[in-house]
């Protein structure tokens, strides 16, 4: 009898634990939904700032909630495939820049020389990682000058983890926190590059999405609208 009662008590405790976890999950989903709606209703201000390095005009942009002057500055460093437009996919809740801005950051993005809205470079084999790291340093210096802050946060993705790491290693006095996501852990490989990266194509842009066995984009996983946004902006290499 005692053993049976103990077993029953254990089952009840397990059931109560599951119910509690379910309530927490539902509450979290409700909070996330409310926050997403609030983010969608938020107005943002986008400003561009003139920046030049080595005679090349660089695109530098600041995004923040309209009417605010955030103290926290964060610089987003893009990867090899796309320019900085990848951080502000203005569709549903896909914009990382707007997500961070809604949480109190002044969000800065820039295009490495030859990318996006920065000036084209004559040598398509440039910029390499070292060159791009100094572009990031130039952007950071301008951000600190404009904002009046002494340090900023840096977030780099993919190849941006390489360039932002090199920038931070050379200029640690500028940086408060460094975040690396989807890092390149083994370098860029030993493959010989024979064609300069002067232009991106829709096919190259599509290559970053999940595909089926026959190589087609898997729209059961990927939102078609997001694919359309990226492919329509692939010229911004």
Where are the predicted features?
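Conserved hydrolase catalytic core segment
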Residues: 150-188
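Conserved acidic catalytic loop of the alpha/beta-hydrolase fold
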Residues: 133-151
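Conserved alpha/beta-hydrolase
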Residues: 94-119
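Short beta-strand element of the alpha/beta-hydrolase
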Residues: 70-79
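Short substrate-entry loop that stabilizes the transition state in hydrolases
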Residues: 80-91
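N-terminal cap/lid segment of alpha/beta-hydrolase-fold proteins
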Residues: 39-67
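Alpha/beta-hydrolase
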Residues: 193-237
């Amino acid at each position: 009898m005692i053993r049976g009662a103990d077993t029953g008590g254990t089952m009840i405790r397990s059931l109560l634990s599951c119910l509690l976890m379910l309530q927490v999950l539902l509450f979290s989903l409700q909070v996330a939904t409310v926050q997403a709606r609030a983010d969608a209703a938020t107005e943002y201000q986008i400003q561009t700032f003139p920046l030049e390095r080595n005679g090349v005009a660089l695109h530098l942009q600041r995004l923040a909630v309209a009417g605010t002057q955030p103290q926290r500055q964060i610089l987003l460093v893009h990867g090899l495939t796309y320019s900085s437009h990848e951080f502000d996919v203005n569709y549903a809740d896909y914009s990382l820049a707007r997500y961070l801005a809604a949480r109190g950051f002044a969000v800065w993005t820039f295009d490495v020389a030859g990318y996006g809205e920065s000036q084209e470079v004559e040598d398509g084999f440039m910029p390499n990682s070292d060159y791009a790291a100094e572009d990031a340093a130039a952007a950071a210096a301008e951000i600190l000058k404009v904002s009046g802050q002494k340090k900023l946060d840096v977030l780099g993705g993919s190849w941006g983890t390489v360039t932002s790491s090199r920038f931070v290693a050379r200029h640690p006095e500028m940086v408060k926190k460094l975040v690396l996501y989807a890092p390149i852990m083994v370098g860029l490989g030993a493959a010989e590059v024979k064609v300069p990266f002067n232009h991106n194509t829709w096919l190259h842009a599509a290559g970053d999405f999940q595909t089926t066995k026959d190589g087609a984009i898997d729209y059961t996983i990927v939102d078609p609208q997001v694919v359309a946004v990226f492919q329509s902006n692939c010229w911004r290499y």
